[in-house]
Each structure stands twice: as structure tokens, then as C-alpha cells.
From Swiss-Prot:
Chief location of this protein within or outside the cell: cytoplasm
Stated family: Belongs to the KLHL40 family.
Role played: Substrate-specific adapter of a BCR (BTB-CUL3-RBX1) E3 ubiquitin ligase complex. Required for skeletal muscle development.
GO biological process, one term: skeletal muscle fiber differentiation
Stretch list, region Disordered: 264-297
Acidic residues biased stretches: 285-295
Protein name: Kelch-like protein 40b
Location of the BTB domain: 33-100
Biased composition (Basic and acidic residues): 264-284
Taxon lineage: Eukaryota, Metazoa, Chordata, Craniata, Vertebrata
Disulfide bonds: none
BACK domain span: 135-237
Stored Pfam families: BACK (PF07707), BTB (PF00651), Kelch_KLHDC2_KLHL20_DRC7 (PF24681)
Length: 618
């Protein structure tokens, strides 16, 4: 439904339309044309009044009184006719076709001609199309055209993705001042200051001969007080480019002194203030100058303000079809990460070693596909926008499958077909994160569903589940991505499915689940080095679909289903639990830390790192 027009604005809108349509009719009819812009071999008839009204450049030119301004034909040099034609059409019609191919030329010419409306259109166009491949180029363009809005937007976009843009050739082409604007930013999304220092060294090394002289000034952008002391001694203080430069060694001594608790004394300077009305006296009394004391600032190299990315916390991430919520077990705080409702029920989730978060599952219907119309959703969480991004869907819809990762690939393993018959699968689909494509990988040696999958050191482990006879399995298999082979490992002590599983301190932990005789709370741990399973502390309650995560070196169990008697009956029924438990290694016991978190209902659970500055505290 269209928004109502403001009655006060309605006459203005009608008059603007009438005026613009009338001017365009005059142009098309070649009436009252008093000016021709000649650009190379092209001529553009137009009206001086329109040019002067829309462009400060032409207004100043026509008012200058110079001989050229009085002539009917005005020659413009170093301008492309096609771009000028686009701009003139906009001045008469308000219509403009900005594309990725012409935006830079339109932007530059509108800047030269000082037409703010087109300038703003180009800025908005570029802001909406910021990407890893163009953000630094747009940042440099914004600086070149003196457009702070565009330069800051592009710089912030680049700072948000600092780890990625430093791999790009465009990063190595930045000028010293452009690089300083990035490295000095508080909004850098880095977990450690070492990353910023190493990016600077990489930039200098790209053209050492010409850039080594910029190092002393650029080093002020690095917050060396945030660097661990052992790293500072080994990688900073002893670096040949730094240790051989007297100016830099003096700065490094300031950092060493700061590490020892000694900061330079800051002198106070006095600034004269102009007299205020309160300081003025009646009559001929002299004005009194007030003096204000101002403290000097610390040298830039001693800046110890945390960067934006340094507010990352390890959290328990609960993902269900109503919201995505992060729980901090150390502070008992809960944060909203996303309120998106596009997450399918009965999904599977995965966090990669790079902390990328993916969700797969559910049914996705593609009406435009001629070959195959049914897919499974595949989504990736974007922390910057707090939303889930649609990725290429999984070609074969399935449920009760497992997800793992190795190198740059995500694996979807086994499960049951989301079709009539619900056939058990051994197929493996692999997603290439670089090329954003799905393909089929080496199949699992057996059919399985309801199993657990974990990844460690580029190996993918498939544990337990149910086989083709619907009986629980104790089988454990590992896939080596380098040899493309599946290999059987030591079996589970207890065959089970729908259990909690995670990597914790380089071992695989399995807790609770479903056995052929019912639910269990038993637990076991697999030593990857010795290929042996051993008993672990039993969970206090028999449960299925328990989630197990390792966060900040601590093991947590979340939710699941337990059996309870029905009212007025001895029959048992499953009841979903939404609690959170923590394992105490010193006491070797499980203890409940949160009785209920409603977002644990129907959720998959991950141990992730998220920036709490982005999240809304509940």
C-alpha cells in the first residue's frame, strides 16, 4: 500500500513535475535552446538556465563574464560524450541509469560539474554494492573525490573484513596515508594486534625500497601495548627493519617502559580562550582572557584502546526457527544474535574452524528449476548484519544427517531422504566455500542416520547412528580428505544414536542418546592419538538429542528429550528439556547452571565466537 502524500508537499510535487516535463518538452522541440555543449564529435543542445540551476560549475562559468561563457557553443575537454548525455538526461527527466560499468565516470563528472543530486545517487549506488573485491577501490575513490560519506563507508566495510582484504592485491597498492586510515581505525575486526602488525610488515615488504621510510610513522598506528610481551620481543623488537632504525627503537623503548608500568609524563599546555559574556564587564574595563589547561596526548604507539574485533567472546549459540540466541555461561548473560525466522525445523548446524556458521536442512522448493525442484536449505550467518544469508541449496534433501568440515569444504553425510520411503543414505555431498558449489564426494561405506559427525585436524569422524536394519551402530569411521578414503576406527563401547558429541581438548566426547533398549545417560571419550574409547562420567538423566559443546575449555550439555510418566498413567512420554549443564573436571560431576532457556527448544547448539558489541542483551 502506497504511503499517503503530505498535503503540504502535494502542490510542490505537481509543480516540480510540471516544470521538469515542460523543460524536457522544450528540449525535445528544440525551443528556446540557447546553448550547445560540444564534447569531442558530439553536440548536446540545452538551456543555460537548466545548467546553471543544477550545476554550481556552470553557474559560476556563466556568471564569470569571460568570452567563452557568452558563446553559444561551449567546448568541454576530457569528458566522455556518453557520460555527459546520461547526466543531461537526468537534469531534464530525473531518470538516470547508473551501472557498475559507468558509475565511476558519472561520479567523477558529477563531482567536477558540482551536481550534488547525481553525486548522492552514485554514492548510494556504490555503498549498496560494497564487496570484498571492490571496497578498497571505492575507499580510494571516495578519498580522491573528497567524499567522506563514501570513504568512511568503504573503510568501515574493509575494517569489518580486515583478515580478508589483507590477502588482496589492492591492499598492497594502498598509499601510506590510505593505509594509515585503515590501520588506525578502532573498528578493525581483529582478535589480536599481531594481525595488524603483520599486515603492516606485509605492505612494506611488497615494495621495501620505497616504503621502508614510511615505517616509523605507520608504526604509530599499531597498538603495541596490546601485543603479548613475548611476541613483542621476538617479532617486533628483533625485526631487522625496526631494530636498525634509531627513530623506531626510541618508540619501541616507550612501549617497553609502558610494559614496565612507566608512561611518559604529559605536560599541560595553556590555551587562551576568547572572553565570554560573563567575563566582560560594564564600562571601559579591560577584557579578561581566560586560560584553559590542556593535557598532551600519549604517542600513538602507546594507544591501548581495544579494537572492535577484540570484544569477541566464546558463547553457546542456540539456533531454532524463531531466533538465534547466544548465551554466555560465565556471566549468565543472554544475547539476541538474529530474529530471522527462515531457519528450518529439524536442521543441522556447523561452525568451522574460521568461526563461519552454517545451517542446513528443511525443504526448499525451486519453481524455476526444470531438472530438480526440491532442495534443502543451506544458510550462512552474517554477524555484520545479524542475519542468515541464503547459499546454494543442497541438491539432495535429507534429514537426520551430519555435517563436518575439512580444508575449504563442508560435508553433508548420510541421513534419510526427505521423500516418500525415506530411504537411508550413505551419500556425501560436499560444498566448496571458495567457488560456492555443491558436488558429490566419496560415499560412506555403510548406510546411516541419526549419527554424530565431528571434525578435527582436517579429518571427519562419523560416529554411531542407526543402520539399514534400524538398529543402533557402534561403528566409527574417519574420512581423510588428502587420501579421499574412509577408514574404520575403534568402535563405541555402547551402540547409540541421537547423542551429544563434540571435540573437547583434542578428544571426542559422546554423551547420552538412544540405544536399542531405550534412552541412556552413559558417556564415553575417544582418544584420537591412541584410537581408544574409555568410559566417561555419566550424564545425570537418560536423554536423546542432547547437544554437547566445548566453550572456553569447558564442556556443556544442552537440552534434549527425557521420558516422563503421563498423568494418571504408567506410560512414558518424551518431554523436551531446555536446560544447560556444565561438567566440572576437578569434581568429575555434571551440574545444572540454567534451568530453562526457551530458545533451546528445537535448537541446534554450537560453541562459537561472537562480538558482544553487535548483540542485543536480553
Amino acid at each position: 500500500m502506497a504511503l499517503p502524500i503530505d498535503p503540504m508537499e502535494e502542490p510542490r510535487m505537481y509543480q516540480q513535475t510540471l516544470l521538469q516535463d515542460g523543460l524536457y518538452d522544450l528540449l525535445e522541440s528544440d525551443m528556446m535552446v540557447d546553448c550547445v555543449l560540444k564534447i569531442k564529435d558530439k553536440e548536446f543542445p540545452c538551456h543555460r538556465l537548466v545548467l546553471a540551476a543544477c550545476s554550481s560549475y556552470f553557474r559560476a562559468f556563466f556568471k564569470s563574464g569571460v568570452e567563452e561563457s557568452k558563446q553559444r557553443e561551449i567546448v568541454l575537454e576530457d569528458v566522455e560524450p556518453g557520460v555527459m548525455g546520461i547526466i543531461l538526461k537526468y537534469l531534464y527527466t530525473s531518470n538516470i541509469n547508473v551501472t557498475e560499468q559507468n558509475v565511476q565516470d558519472i561520479f567523477a563528472l558529477s563531482n567536477m560539474l558540482q551536481i550534488p543530486s547525481i553525486f548522492t545517487v552514485c554514492v548510494s549506488f556504490l555503498q549498496k554494492r560494497l564487496s570484498l573485491s571492490n571496497c578498497l577501490a571505492i575507499f580510494r575513490l571516495g578519498l580522491m573525490l573528497d567524499c567522506p560519506r563514501l570513504a568512511i563507508s568503504a573503510r568501515n566495510f574493509a575494517c569489518e573484513r580486515f583478515q580478508f582484504i589483507t590477502r588482496d592485491e589492492e591492499f598492497l597498492q594502498l598509499t601510506p596515508s590510505e593505509l594509515a586510515a585503515v590501520l588506525a581505525s578502532d573498528s578493525l575486526n581483529v582478535e589480536t594486534e599481531q594481525d595488524v602488525f603483520e599486515a603492516l610488515i606485509k605492505w612494506v615488504g611488497h615494495d621495501q625500497e620505497n616504503r621502508i621510510g614510511d615505517l616509523p610513522d605507520l608504526l604509530d598506528c599499531i597498538r603495541l601495548r596490546l601485543v603479548p610481551r613475548d611476541y613483542f620481543v621476538k617479532n617486533v623488537e628483533k625485526h631487522e627493519w625496526l631494530s636498525s632504525n634509531p627513530e623506531i627503537t626510541k618508540k619501541l623503548q616507550l612501549v617497553k617502559d609502558a610494559h614496565a608500568g612507566k608512561l611518559p609524563e604529559l605536560k599541560k599546555t595553556k590555551n587562551k580562550k576568547s572572553p565570554s559574556e560573563e567575563g566582560q564587564k560594564k564600562g571601559d574595563e579591560e577584557e579578561v582572557e581566560e586560560e584553559e589547561e590542556q593535557e598532551e596526548r600519549l604517542p600513538g604507539i602507546l594507544n591501548d584502546n581495544l579494537r572492535f574485533g577484540m570484544f569477541l567472546r566464546e558463547l553457546i549459540f542456540l539456533i531454532n526457527d524463531s531466533a538465534s540466541v547466544a548465551y554466555d555461561p560465565t556471566g549468565n548473560d543472554c544475547y539476541v544474535a538474529s530474529v530471522s525466522t527462515q531457519i528450518p525445523k529439524n536442521h543441522c548446524s556447523l561452525v568451522t574452524k574460521e568461526n563461519q556458521i552454517f545451517v542446513a536442512g528443511g525443504l526448499f522448493f525451486d519453481e524455476q528449476s526444470k531438472d530438480e525442484q526440491i532442495y534443502s536449505y543451506f544458510l550462512q550467518f552474517d554477524p555484520a548484519s545479524s542475519d542468515w544469508m541464503g547459499m546454494p541449496p543442497i541438491p539432495s534433501p535429507r534429514f537426520l544427517f551430519g555435517m563436518g568440515e575439512a580444508e575449504n569444504f563442508i560435508f553433508v553425510i548420510g541421513g534419510r531422504e526427505m521423500k516418500e520411503g525415506e530411504n537411508i543414505l550413505n551419500t556425501v555431498m560436499v560444498y566448496d566455500r571458495q567457488f560456492l558449489k555443491w558436488a558429490e564426494s566419496d560415499p560412506l561405506p555403510y548406510l546411516v542416520y541419526g549419527h554424530g559427525v565431528v571434525s578435527h585436524n582436517e579429518m571427519i569422524y562419523v560416529i554411531g547412528g542407526k543402520g539399514e536394519n534400524k538398529e543402533c551402530l557402534n561403528r566409527v569411521c574417519a574420512y581423510d580428505i588428502k587420501t579421499h578414503q574412509w577408514k574404520d576406527l575403534a568402535p563405541l563401547n555402547t551402540a547409540r544414536s541421537l547423542f551429544g558429541v563434540t571435540i573437547h581438548k583434542n578428544n571426542i566426547y559422546v554423551v547420552a542418546g538412544v540405544t536399542d533398549s531405550g534412552l541412556t545417560g552413559s558417556a564415553e571419550v575417544y582418544d584420537i592419538k591412541t584410537n581408544k574409547w574409555s568410559e566417561f562420567v555419566e550424564f545425570p538423566q537418560d536423554r536423546s538429542s542432547l547437544s554437547l559443546v566445548s566453550v572456553s575449555g569447558v564442556l556443556y550439555a544442552v537440552g534434549g528429550f527425557a521420558m516422563f510418566p503421563k498423568e494418571d498413567s504408567d506410560d512414558l512420554m518424551p518431554l523436551e528439556m531446555n536446560d544447560i549443564w556444565r561438567y566440572d573436571e576437578s569434581e568429575r560431576t555434571w551440574s545444572g547452571i540454567l534451568r530453562e532457556n526457551r530458545y533451546a527448544s528445537g535448537a541446534t547448539v554450537l560453541g562459537v565466537r561472537l562480538n558482544t558489541l553487535r548483540l542485543t542483551k536480553m
